[in-house]
UniProtKB/Swiss-Prot annotation:
The gene is CRN8. Residues 117-590 are annotated as: C-terminal D2 effector domain. It is an enzyme of class 2 (transferase). Residues 577-599 are annotated as: Disordered. This is Crinkler effector protein 8. GO terms for molecular function: protein serine kinase activity; protein serine/threonine kinase activity. In the N-terminal section; belongs to the Crinkler effector family. In the C-terminal section; belongs to the protein kinase superfamily. Changing residue 470 to A: Impairs autophosphorylation but does not affect host cell death induction. It catalyses: L-seryl-[protein] + ATP = O-phospho-L-seryl-[protein] + ADP + H(+); L-threonyl-[protein] + ATP = O-phospho-L-threonyl-[protein] + ADP + H(+). A motif (Host nuclear localization signal) lies at residues 590-599. Residues 1-17 form the signal peptide. InterPro entries: Crinkler_N, Kinase-like_dom_sf. GO terms for cellular component: extracellular region; host cell nucleus.
Amino acid sequence: MVTLFCAVVGVAGSTFPVDINENKSVGHLKKAIKEEKMYQFPADELQLFLAKAGGNAWLSSLTEDVKKLKKGEKTALVKSLTQEEKELQGEDPISECLEGMDPPKVKQIHVLVALPPGTSSAPISDGTDLWLSRFQHSEVAKLTLLPTRGDLNEFIGQPLPVKIGLPQSVFQAWSSPLILGQLLRDKLFELNDISPCEFLKDSVFSAAFLYPQVDGDATESAFHYFWDSIIRVVLGFVFRRAYVNRDSSRKSSSGLKRPDFLFALDHICVFRGEEKEPRTSITVPREELSKKLVWSYGGVPYVFGYAASGFELELFAIYQDVTGNVKTHLIGGFNLQHAPERFRLVLALLNLCLLFPAIVQNCPASAGTEFMDIHRANGVKVRLSPIFVDKIFHTQEEYRRVKQIYDSLKAYGVPCADAVVTVDSDQLRLTLKPRGIEMKPCSLSELFVALGNVLEALVVLHRNGWMHRDIRWSNVIKHIDRVEWFLIDFADAAQSPQKYPSGDHLTHDEHASDIFMEGGSHTTAVDLWAVGYLVKTSKIEREWTAEPERALFLDRLMNPDPSARPTADEALQLLSRFEREAAEQESQGKGVRKKHRRA
């Protein structure tokens, strides 16, 4: 068995080895070369020549002839070696061809391969899919392997782990300093005339990328297509199933909410952008990157974003500092008016793509709800943003009814409840605040807080003759930044009493039975039953009922007879007493345990 290094004449690319038994024929060698290079024509159409340097020596890889050969150029020596009379014949044995030559070694060229006429410069296949597969296999696998914030500037400028193959004509044309330059070219691309990434080239480096039709006096809207032609195209090309949205708060009346550009993997916004027209200072979108973000990414070191003002663009790592504040760390600046800077941004974005999966995999579930659209069965669309919640109604009637309810809540000063901050009658949209997280209490002390918050709201609500009617944990939401809860979704709220069938659409297993009694009516007492239901469906019902008086209180709350249930005022007073007693018992227990340890 012998290893022969082969080079294709007239085609840019690296040499390749072929292992073959010396007892085989040149025809077998042609077949092996065809299989290695996946050529789509018969093997016998290949022409093979020995790469002799003179005497019994082989062409050295260090010579100028071989260097030019790899670039697709034919030197006088290569032309002389590939004359027709020197072609190896298919029936010739390999051993006879090698007779009199030095034993083949590495750093040599042994066989020159000439392709059939008409195929010398034609690609055999598009290399885009193979490039993408290899590139994605280069992703950073673990969170601990992510570069530090301080190293990100160097990281985004490093050569790609898998270079993008370009045909010789494009490779040479883009080498101009006005387009790319050799240093940046060699970080992004490599010569490949056999299977260049034609689809990638045409998709990412399109005419819109190379020759942008926008100038420095254009509006922000005019720049959207330009920014997208780089950022959206690159990210979307690498991650085909990602969610990409832009300008999603423009139609909203609630001010700061969603970013101007949003890129999410598995529902997690790992990359975002804030954009302004050219005449705006870039400090404005830079500050919006941190102001619009409420950190929900747990312990990951950072996510990413950009600030753009016309052609000026800055890349940032966005992180949470030790005090809990969201900060930005500049990792790169670009003047996209110039072609080399646009290519440099592509390099930075592709390198950042290598980090996205590890970040997404280590985010908590809450990060996936930062931006989410929920479609209710009643036709209401709920749009979640970091700080706000939009509710878009299906009918004018429903929009007005819910708006009137929230207007009443505001007039009464109902505490511990969400509130409408802006309205859009044209879009049938109510924007509510705050935005919290759906999380049940994890301890008895937290349950006291949550129930107390609900009862504080009910005291004021009931005092003004209203009832919520749909209290359950999905409508009791925890604040993002503190251990307190608030009541949401007053769409089913009504004045007390209500006659059957009002409220009949509610679920029987989650609501008091008096709502569903034919011919009957229900009052604010249904909300007290619901407070008991919160205890029953909490994570710590057993701990609650371990105290007999608390267990009796739970029975009273959920008594089938509405008149036997306590009022919200009474329930809040009892809850406060239970909370004090539990705190005293906990304090006494700690004292006893401390004495035992001393003993």
